Amino acid sequence: MNKVYDWFEERLEIQAIADDITSKYVPPHVNIFYCLGGITLTCFLIQFATGFAMTFYYKPTVAEAFASVQYIMNEVNFGWLIRSIHKWSASMMVLMMILHVFRVYLTGGFKKPRELTWVTGVVLAVITVSFGVTGYSLPWDQVGYWAVKIVSGIPAAIPVVGDQLVELMRGGESVGQATLTRFYSLHTFVLPWSIAVFMLMHFLMIRKQGISGPL
Protein backbone atom coordinates (compact mmCIF):
# COMPACT_ATOMS: atom_id res chain seq x y z
CA MET A 1 0.00 0.00 0.00
CA ASN A 2 2.87 2.34 0.83
CA LYS A 3 4.40 1.72 -2.58
CA VAL A 4 1.14 2.74 -4.27
CA TYR A 5 0.98 5.90 -2.15
CA ASP A 6 4.62 6.70 -2.85
CA TRP A 7 4.00 6.28 -6.59
CA PHE A 8 1.18 8.85 -6.54
CA GLU A 9 3.06 11.11 -4.11
CA GLU A 10 6.07 11.26 -6.40
CA ARG A 11 3.93 12.42 -9.32
CA LEU A 12 1.15 14.48 -7.72
CA GLU A 13 2.61 15.66 -4.38
CA ILE A 14 -0.54 14.57 -2.58
CA GLN A 15 0.86 15.34 0.87
CA ALA A 16 1.57 18.96 -0.03
CA ILE A 17 -2.01 19.37 -1.27
CA ALA A 18 -3.41 17.76 1.89
CA ASP A 19 -1.23 19.95 4.11
CA ASP A 20 -2.39 23.07 2.29
CA ILE A 21 -6.05 22.10 2.75
CA THR A 22 -5.80 21.13 6.41
CA SER A 23 -3.48 23.92 7.56
CA LYS A 24 -5.62 26.89 6.48
CA TYR A 25 -5.90 29.45 9.28
CA VAL A 26 -9.34 29.78 10.88
CA PRO A 27 -9.93 33.12 12.67
CA PRO A 28 -10.98 32.84 16.34
CA HIS A 29 -14.21 34.77 15.78
CA VAL A 30 -15.62 32.06 13.49
CA ASN A 31 -18.68 30.32 14.96
CA ILE A 32 -21.41 27.89 13.87
CA PHE A 33 -23.09 30.55 11.71
CA TYR A 34 -20.07 30.47 9.41
CA CYS A 35 -21.00 26.87 8.55
CA LEU A 36 -24.22 27.86 6.76
CA GLY A 37 -22.53 27.99 3.36
CA GLY A 38 -21.08 24.52 3.87
CA ILE A 39 -24.48 23.19 4.92
CA THR A 40 -25.95 24.68 1.73
CA LEU A 41 -23.31 22.83 -0.29
CA THR A 42 -24.11 19.59 1.55
CA CYS A 43 -27.79 20.01 0.70
CA PHE A 44 -26.87 20.53 -2.95
CA LEU A 45 -24.83 17.32 -3.02
CA ILE A 46 -27.79 15.45 -1.54
CA GLN A 47 -30.00 17.07 -4.18
CA PHE A 48 -27.64 15.98 -6.92
CA ALA A 49 -27.48 12.37 -5.73
CA THR A 50 -31.22 11.92 -5.15
CA GLY A 51 -32.15 13.82 -8.31
CA PHE A 52 -29.79 11.70 -10.39
CA ALA A 53 -31.38 8.57 -8.94
CA MET A 54 -34.86 9.74 -9.92
CA THR A 55 -33.87 10.46 -13.53
CA PHE A 56 -33.75 6.68 -14.09
CA TYR A 57 -37.53 6.51 -13.63
CA TYR A 58 -38.95 9.98 -14.29
CA LYS A 59 -40.53 10.58 -17.72
CA PRO A 60 -40.61 14.27 -18.77
CA THR A 61 -43.83 14.17 -20.80
CA VAL A 62 -47.17 15.74 -19.95
CA ALA A 63 -48.84 12.33 -20.37
CA GLU A 64 -46.45 10.33 -18.19
CA ALA A 65 -44.75 12.72 -15.74
CA PHE A 66 -47.29 12.41 -12.94
CA ALA A 67 -47.58 8.64 -13.35
CA SER A 68 -43.79 8.25 -13.29
CA VAL A 69 -43.59 10.20 -10.03
CA GLN A 70 -46.26 7.94 -8.54
CA TYR A 71 -44.26 4.95 -9.76
CA ILE A 72 -41.18 6.29 -7.98
CA MET A 73 -43.16 6.79 -4.78
CA ASN A 74 -45.03 3.48 -4.78
CA GLU A 75 -43.10 0.92 -6.82
CA VAL A 76 -39.38 1.74 -6.84
CA ASN A 77 -37.41 0.36 -3.90
CA PHE A 78 -36.90 3.22 -1.46
CA GLY A 79 -38.22 5.58 -4.13
CA TRP A 80 -40.47 7.28 -1.58
CA LEU A 81 -37.44 7.87 0.63
CA ILE A 82 -35.27 9.21 -2.20
CA ARG A 83 -37.94 11.65 -3.37
CA SER A 84 -38.74 12.73 0.20
CA ILE A 85 -35.06 13.41 0.89
CA HIS A 86 -34.89 15.36 -2.38
CA LYS A 87 -37.92 17.41 -1.39
CA TRP A 88 -36.85 18.21 2.16
CA SER A 89 -33.21 18.87 1.31
CA ALA A 90 -34.43 21.31 -1.35
CA SER A 91 -36.31 23.28 1.30
CA MET A 92 -33.31 23.06 3.62
CA MET A 93 -30.98 24.28 0.88
CA VAL A 94 -33.08 27.38 0.25
CA LEU A 95 -33.36 28.10 3.98
CA MET A 96 -29.62 27.67 4.60
CA MET A 97 -28.83 29.81 1.56
CA ILE A 98 -31.02 32.65 2.86
CA LEU A 99 -29.46 32.44 6.33
CA HIS A 100 -25.99 32.37 4.77
CA VAL A 101 -26.71 35.52 2.76
CA PHE A 102 -27.95 37.29 5.90
CA ARG A 103 -24.88 36.18 7.87
CA VAL A 104 -22.49 37.45 5.20
CA TYR A 105 -24.35 40.75 4.92
CA LEU A 106 -24.62 41.36 8.67
CA THR A 107 -20.93 40.57 9.26
CA GLY A 108 -19.76 42.72 6.33
CA GLY A 109 -18.37 39.81 4.34
CA PHE A 110 -19.33 41.53 1.08
CA LYS A 111 -16.94 44.45 1.54
CA LYS A 112 -13.58 45.04 -0.14
CA PRO A 113 -11.74 42.90 -1.21
CA ARG A 114 -14.53 40.31 -1.33
CA GLU A 115 -16.97 42.05 -3.69
CA LEU A 116 -16.63 39.38 -6.39
CA THR A 117 -17.21 36.63 -3.84
CA TRP A 118 -20.46 38.39 -2.93
CA VAL A 119 -21.45 38.72 -6.61
CA THR A 120 -20.92 35.01 -7.26
CA GLY A 121 -22.89 34.29 -4.09
CA VAL A 122 -25.83 36.35 -5.34
CA VAL A 123 -25.72 34.46 -8.65
CA LEU A 124 -25.73 31.18 -6.70
CA ALA A 125 -28.77 32.39 -4.75
CA VAL A 126 -30.64 33.13 -7.99
CA ILE A 127 -29.72 29.70 -9.38
CA THR A 128 -30.90 28.04 -6.16
CA VAL A 129 -34.31 29.71 -6.42
CA SER A 130 -34.44 28.74 -10.11
CA PHE A 131 -33.91 25.12 -9.10
CA GLY A 132 -36.98 25.39 -6.89
CA VAL A 133 -39.12 26.98 -9.59
CA THR A 134 -38.19 24.46 -12.29
CA GLY A 135 -38.32 21.43 -10.02
CA TYR A 136 -41.74 22.35 -8.67
CA SER A 137 -43.27 21.81 -12.10
CA LEU A 138 -41.80 18.40 -12.90
CA PRO A 139 -44.49 16.21 -11.24
CA TRP A 140 -46.91 17.97 -13.62
CA ASP A 141 -49.79 17.78 -11.18
CA GLN A 142 -52.31 20.58 -10.64
CA VAL A 143 -49.97 22.48 -8.32
CA GLY A 144 -47.01 22.15 -10.69
CA TYR A 145 -49.02 23.08 -13.79
CA TRP A 146 -50.53 26.23 -12.35
CA ALA A 147 -47.23 27.22 -10.74
CA VAL A 148 -45.58 27.07 -14.17
CA LYS A 149 -48.43 29.01 -15.75
CA ILE A 150 -48.16 31.79 -13.17
CA VAL A 151 -44.36 31.97 -13.09
CA SER A 152 -43.98 31.89 -16.87
CA GLY A 153 -46.61 34.61 -17.21
CA ILE A 154 -44.84 37.09 -14.93
CA PRO A 155 -42.44 38.41 -17.63
CA ALA A 156 -45.48 39.56 -19.64
CA ALA A 157 -45.48 42.71 -17.49
CA ILE A 158 -42.08 43.73 -18.89
CA PRO A 159 -42.45 46.41 -21.59
CA VAL A 160 -41.54 45.62 -25.21
CA VAL A 161 -39.96 42.17 -24.69
CA GLY A 162 -42.43 40.73 -22.16
CA ASP A 163 -44.47 38.62 -24.55
CA GLN A 164 -41.35 37.27 -26.23
CA LEU A 165 -39.92 36.21 -22.87
CA VAL A 166 -43.14 34.41 -21.98
CA GLU A 167 -43.08 32.53 -25.26
CA LEU A 168 -39.42 31.68 -24.76
CA MET A 169 -40.10 30.22 -21.31
CA ARG A 170 -43.17 28.28 -22.40
CA GLY A 171 -41.86 27.17 -25.77
CA GLY A 172 -45.02 28.52 -27.35
CA GLU A 173 -48.08 30.60 -26.60
CA SER A 174 -49.45 28.21 -23.97
CA VAL A 175 -48.10 25.90 -21.27
CA GLY A 176 -47.59 22.37 -22.57
CA GLN A 177 -45.07 19.71 -23.51
CA ALA A 178 -42.49 22.24 -24.72
CA THR A 179 -42.71 24.01 -21.35
CA LEU A 180 -42.14 20.83 -19.38
CA THR A 181 -39.23 19.86 -21.62
CA ARG A 182 -37.57 23.25 -21.13
CA PHE A 183 -38.05 23.21 -17.36
CA TYR A 184 -36.72 19.65 -17.18
CA SER A 185 -33.66 20.58 -19.25
CA LEU A 186 -33.03 23.61 -17.06
CA HIS A 187 -33.46 21.62 -13.85
CA THR A 188 -31.28 18.64 -14.80
CA PHE A 189 -28.64 20.12 -17.10
CA VAL A 190 -28.35 23.90 -17.41
CA LEU A 191 -28.75 24.83 -13.74
CA PRO A 192 -26.54 22.03 -12.32
CA TRP A 193 -23.67 22.99 -14.63
CA SER A 194 -24.20 26.67 -13.88
CA ILE A 195 -24.21 26.20 -10.13
CA ALA A 196 -21.12 23.97 -10.32
CA VAL A 197 -19.17 26.66 -12.20
CA PHE A 198 -20.16 29.47 -9.84
CA MET A 199 -19.60 27.30 -6.76
CA LEU A 200 -16.07 26.59 -7.94
CA MET A 201 -15.45 30.31 -8.47
CA HIS A 202 -17.01 31.10 -5.09
CA PHE A 203 -14.89 28.57 -3.20
CA LEU A 204 -11.66 29.50 -4.97
CA MET A 205 -12.18 33.14 -3.99
CA ILE A 206 -12.89 32.17 -0.38
CA ARG A 207 -9.82 29.94 -0.40
CA LYS A 208 -7.66 32.74 -1.78
CA GLN A 209 -8.97 35.60 0.40
CA GLY A 210 -9.84 33.68 3.54
CA ILE A 211 -12.75 34.29 5.90
CA SER A 212 -13.61 37.92 6.56
CA GLY A 213 -12.66 39.38 9.92
CA PRO A 214 -15.04 40.54 12.65
CA LEU A 215 -16.86 43.87 12.34
Curated annotation (Swiss-Prot):
Disulfide bonding pattern of the chain: none
Cofactor note: Binds 2 heme b groups non-covalently with two histidine residues as axial ligands.
Superkingdom of this protein's organism: Bacteria
One GO CC term, this protein: plasma membrane-derived thylakoid membrane
Residues holding heme c: C35
Keyword Secreted: no
Keywords tagged on the record: Electron transport, Heme, Iron, Membrane, Metal-binding, Photosynthesis, Thylakoid, Transmembrane, Transmembrane helix, Transport
Cofactor: heme b; heme c
Claim: Metal-binding is one of the keywords in the record: yes
Pfam families in UniProt: Cytochrome_B
GO molecular function annotations of the record: electron transporter, transferring electrons within cytochrome b6/f complex of photosystem II activity; metal ion binding; oxidoreductase activity
Subcellular location: Cellular thylakoid membrane
Positions contributing to heme b 2 binding: H86, H187
Transmembrane segments: 32-52, 90-110, 116-136, 186-206
Membrane topology: Multi-pass membrane protein
Gene Ontology biological process: photosynthesis; respiratory electron transport chain
Binding site residues for heme b 1: H100, H202
PANTHER family: CYTOCHROME B (PTHR19271:SF16)
Note in the entry: Heme 1 (or BH or b566) is high-potential and absorbs at about 566 nm, and heme 2 (or BL or b562) is low-potential and absorbs at about 562 nm.
Assembly and oligomerization: The 4 large subunits of the cytochrome b6-f complex are cytochrome b6, subunit IV (17 kDa polypeptide, PetD), cytochrome f and the Rieske protein, while the 4 small subunits are PetG, PetL, PetM and PetN. The complex functions as a dimer.
Family listed: Belongs to the cytochrome b family. PetB subfamily.
Function: Component of the cytochrome b6-f complex, which mediates electron transfer between photosystem II (PSII) and photosystem I (PSI), cyclic electron flow around PSI, and state transitions.
Name this protein carries in UniProt: Cytochrome b6
Species, as recorded: Thermosynechococcus vestitus (strain NIES-2133 / IAM M-273 / BP-1)
Highest classification ranks of the organism: Bacteria, Bacillati, Cyanobacteriota, Cyanophyceae, Acaryochloridales
